[in-house]
Amino acid sequence: NYLWLCLIALPLGLGAGSVDAALNDFVARNFAARHMNWLHSFWGVGATSGPLIMAFMLSQTGRWQMGYRTVAIVQFTLVAILAFSLPLWQRFPTPTSPHTTTGRVKIRKLKGIAPNLVAFFAYCAVELSTGLWAASFLVQQRGLSQVLAAGGASAYYLGITVGRFLNGFLSSHFKAKNLVRGGVAMILVGIILMFLPFPILSLAGLMIIGLGCAPIYPTLLHETPRRFGAENSATLMGLQMATAYVGLTLMPPLLGVVVGRFGLQFFPLGLLLLALLLVFGTERLNKVLAEQQA
């Protein structure tokens, strides 16, 4: 029943957060940037597949429980894959992480940590706020049908997925900070298009925002051991994940309260403010790192 669904969401979230942090840390330390981008492009495949599985099960059985049972089977399959692949993980060196109190104090004193966390918070706030509220904006403010609006939201996530796949190739030719800057610039362009009162431009803006989002998150994650040291990577990865999830959890409903009070016409403005916070975080981080290297 629904109560049990809410209760099991807690251990599911704890497990997902642990796997997320550990897997990102492992890939960041041992693989190239292209692998991190391709890893996160498959997040897009999963994010797209989940609603499709639920919709299919609802149409076939009329019961939402079957959708969750199907996803549970996928989760147990994932657990089995992770368990059987553990010997492969042990082939790679594991740096000593600073788990002591002194180590944690050292982490907090690393230069660039604060703007780095701001960037993670703001990025995830932009990503999920766009995905959750874009369809409503297109219907109520641009007069699109629900079908077209849903297609626009799907195009947004498709942009993230395809963009990350392509970014896997681009990461070999461009510096990490330039990939992030390019992504942030595309997000700003997409948001500006959403201010304009033309449905086709709003749809295009949504797709551009998705493409802009593509390189930012995996690139920031992959640079963690290089910017802050491999010995700090595991602890920092967890801290970054936690900060990102705070952005995911708090900002979309907060933006919903604002647009509910003042109207969905303020949705692009809310996205713009979050995007400017992302600009501040990424550029401040670049400045701190440049000063360290000087």
Stretches found by the model and what they are:
Residues K111-V162:
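Extracytoplasmic gate region of multi-pass secondary transporters
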Residues W89-L117:
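Juxtamembrane intracellular "pre-TM" segments in multi-pass secondary transporters
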Residues I53-G62, L138-V139, L170-S171, L254-G263:
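Interfacial helix-cap and linker-helix signal at transmembrane-aqueous boundaries
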